[in-house]
């Protein structure tokens, strides 16, 4: 049985039964050289302040999975935006058909060595501050830019933040998780 590491995005806590999913993956990878089940959730937001006004704000969220089966020189891949046992079962069937090669037993490739380098904090930049705080920050930056020089006629500020959370299920390792928060601020 594979142990689950703590992660804010964990499809086994919300969408799936872990034991059933492992069985589907075992079936999909039977006789394969390599493969995995990759889960992903993305959230992003952006703000545009122009001409002293909030011109645009957007928010989007998506999630899904991909299942990869490698057999000799062939790779079968299937994906879906719906994280469910039914979707994973269909993806497994598709991946197996796509990667089907000559019969015979093969061993799965070993997972890459885990580096455990923490490159980012676990903070979600979207949830870290309120909508009004972000708008106030943009207005403060706008005022600062205009005060730098009286020749400044127009200021455009774009604030974009996102978080990508992934979980990778392989048969030879515990569930692998990563969180990638990003923030971009541009002023022109």
Language model region names:
Residues 71-82, 139-154, 188:
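Hydrophobic transmembrane alpha-helix bundles
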Residues 45-100:
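N-terminal alpha-helical targeting/anchoring segments
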Residues 52-54, 59, 113, 131, ...:
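Short capping/connector residues at structural and topological boundaries
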Residues 37, 65-69, 187:
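Short beta-strand motif preference
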Residues 2-26, 32-46, 90-178:
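Acidic low-complexity segments
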Residues 177-188:
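Acidic/histidine-enriched ion/cofactor-binding microenvironments in catalytic or ligand-binding pockets
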């Amino acid at each position: 049985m594979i142990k689950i590491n703590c992660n804010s995005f964990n499809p086994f806590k919300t969408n799936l039964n872990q034991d059933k999913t492992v069985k589907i993956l075992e079936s999909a990878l039977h006789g394969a050289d390599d493969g995995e089940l990759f889960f992903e959730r993305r959230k992003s937001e952006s703000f545009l302040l122009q001409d002293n006004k909030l011109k645009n704000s957007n928010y989007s969220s998506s999630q899904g999975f991909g299942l990869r089966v490698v057999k000799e020189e062939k790779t079968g891949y299937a994906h879906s935006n719906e994280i469910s046992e039914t979707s994973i079962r269909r993806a497994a069937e598709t991946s197996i058909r796509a990667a089907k090669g000559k019969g015979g037993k093969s061993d799965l490739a070993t997972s890459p060595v885990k580096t455990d380098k923490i490159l980012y904090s676990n903070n979600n930049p979207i949830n870290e501050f309120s909508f009004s705080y972000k708008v106030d920050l943009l207005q403060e930056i706008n005022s600062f830019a205009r005060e730098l020089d009286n020749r400044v006629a127009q200021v455009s500020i774009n604030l974009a933040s996102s978080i990508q959370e992934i979980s990778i299920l392989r048969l030879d390792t515990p569930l692998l998780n990563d969180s990638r928060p990003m923030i971009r601020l541009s002023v022109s």
